[in-house]
Amino acid sequence: PMVLIRACDEKVVGVLRILSWPVPTSLATYDTAESLTSVDIPGRGRSHADMQAAFMQHQTTSVQDDTCWYSGAKFGRIAVSKDSRGQGCGRLLVEGAQAWVVQAVRQHASVPAEVHRLGIVFQLSSQIEVQSFYESLGFQVQGDSYMEEGHPHIWCKKSVLTDV
């Protein structure tokens, strides 16, 4: 996950989970609570490049004209602490996550010579009450609302183009 930490007191004020899309179907192994108390949290110590390479393993691609489209990412579990809302923290998280994915694709892209641009798709399931926030970041609503975890949600999608 991407974590936003306030500099003055090192308090976590927001989190965002970045998932490769489509979400991998292989079963993930999880550490037990006991193992987490005796060792560092999994993922710590991994290089930025290693995490991006792992993310890229699950990407699918298609070439349309001069653009290679990557399946991109699904953002999930986006949360900002109540006392930090309305201060731009959510925007920082989403824009930071998008930049991380774009950097991963640009650094690990393997594309044919006729490709001059990379396209990346971002998706998320938004609670209806914060739909306008995601629309302000360029996401577009896809389909009808649905219930998820007891709250009405809407699927949102955004496509980004970048040079190779």
Predicted regions located by residue number:
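Short hydrophobic/aromatic beta-strand element in the GNAT-like acyltransferase core
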Residues: P1-I5, V15, R77, Q123, ...
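Conserved beta-strand in the GNAT
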Residues: V3, E10-W21, T29, R46, ...
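Short coil/turn motifs at secondary-structure junctions
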Residues: W21-V23, D83, E129-Q131, L161
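Eukaryotic N-terminal low-complexity, Ser/Thr- and Lys/Arg-rich leader segments
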Residues: L27-C68, Q103-P112, L161-V164
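Conserved acetyl-CoA-binding loop-helix of GNAT-fold acetyltransferases
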Residues: V80, G86-V102
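Acidic/histidine-enriched, beta-strand-rich ligand/metal-binding domains
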Residues: D83-G86, A104-P112, Q131-S136
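Conserved GNAT acetyl-CoA-binding A-motif
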Residues: V94, V101-Q127
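Conserved catalytic-core motifs of GNAT/GCN5-like acyltransferases
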Residues: V121-S125, E135, Q140-K158
